Amino acid sequence: MGQKIHPTGFRLAVSRNWASRWYANNNNFAAMLQEDIGVREYLKKKLKNASVGRVVIERPAKNARITIYSSRPGVVIGKKGEDIEQLKTELQRRMGVPVHVNIEEIRKPETDAQLIADSITQQLERRIMFRRAMKRAMQNAMRLGAQGIKIMSAGRLNGIEIARTEWYREGRVPLHTLRADIDYATSEAKTTYGIIGVKVWVYKGDTLGRNDAPVVEEVAEDKRPRRNARPGDRRPRRDGEGGAPGARRGAPRRGAGKPEDGKTGE
C-alpha cells in the first residue's frame, strides 16, 4: 500500500516529524487542532508571495512557537521588521497566547515539494502549458541534487472537456522504503476551467531515522569447492563420494576386490 498511503504519515516517528508538536487532553484537542488549521490557512494566504514551504507549530507551557520555512525570508520579515511584528500581533490575537515567530530559510527551493507544487499551480493559473511547467520543475530538481521526482496533475488540463490525470517521473521514487526521505506536497490551481490538482513527490536519498539501526555486514562464506564435488550435481555418485548429505553410497567400482592379474587367491 505504499503507492496509496500518505508518504509523510507513513514515515512519522521513523524518518519524519510532526508539523504540530504539542499535547492536549481529550477536551481541548479538537479546538487546538482546528486552531492550527486556521493559523496555517491564514499564513498561506498572508504570505502567498513569500514562498512558504511549511509551518511548524509548538505549544510549550501556555505559549506558542511558530517556525516558518521560507525561501524568501526577507519578504516575511519586511522592511526593518515591520511585517513580522504585524504578523506576530495577529497570531497572538487568533491564538490567545504569547507567540514567538521564527523564520528558517530554505536553501534549495527547487528540491522542496511544496514550493515545486505552488510554482506549477501559479504557472497553470497564468495559462502556461502544464507539460512545460512539470518538465521544467523536474529538470531543476534533478540538477540541484534530487535523486528522483514524480509530478502528477489532474483536472481539465489545457481546458479539455473531460478531466484526466497525467504524471511524469524522473529518477527513483521508492515509496515503500521507510528510510527513504520522501518530500510530498499538494497544491491547487484555480483556473477558469475549474480546479487542477498537483501532487509532487521528491526523493532526496536515504536517511537514518530515530528507530533505524546500523546495518551489520555479513561474514563472507567460504566459497571453496568441496573435494570431488561436481557443481550442480545433487545425485549420489557411483563411487559414493558426491551427492547430497546422507545420500546412499553407490555400488563398488568395477574391478574392486578382484585379484590382480597372474595371482590367484587362496
Curated annotation (Swiss-Prot):
All copies of domain KH type-2, residue ranges: 39-107
CDD domains on file: KH-II_30S_S3 (cd02412)
Positions of the UniProt region annotated as Disordered: 218-266
Gene Ontology annotations of biological process type: translation
GO cellular component assignments: cytosolic small ribosomal subunit
Pfam families: KH_2, Ribosomal_S3_C
Disulfide bonds: none
SMART domains reported in the protein's UniProt record: KH (SM00322)
Sequence ranges of Basic and acidic residues compositional bias: 230-241, 257-266
Gene3D superfamilies listed in its UniProt record: 3.30.300.20, Ribosomal protein S3, C-terminal domain (3.30.1140.32)
Keyword Electron transport: no
Keyword set includes Aminoacyl-tRNA synthetase: no
Keywords noted in UniProt: Ribonucleoprotein, Ribosomal protein, RNA-binding, rRNA-binding
Molecular functions per Gene Ontology: mRNA binding; rRNA binding; structural constituent of ribosome
Subunit structure: Part of the 30S ribosomal subunit. Forms a tight complex with proteins S10 and S14.
Family indicated by similarity: Belongs to the universal ribosomal protein uS3 family.
Summary of the function given for this chain in its UniProt record: Binds the lower part of the 30S subunit head. Binds mRNA in the 70S ribosome, positioning it for translation.
Name listed for the protein in its UniProt record: Small ribosomal subunit protein uS3
Organism lineage: Bacteria, Pseudomonadati, Pseudomonadota, Betaproteobacteria, Burkholderiales
Gene: rpsC
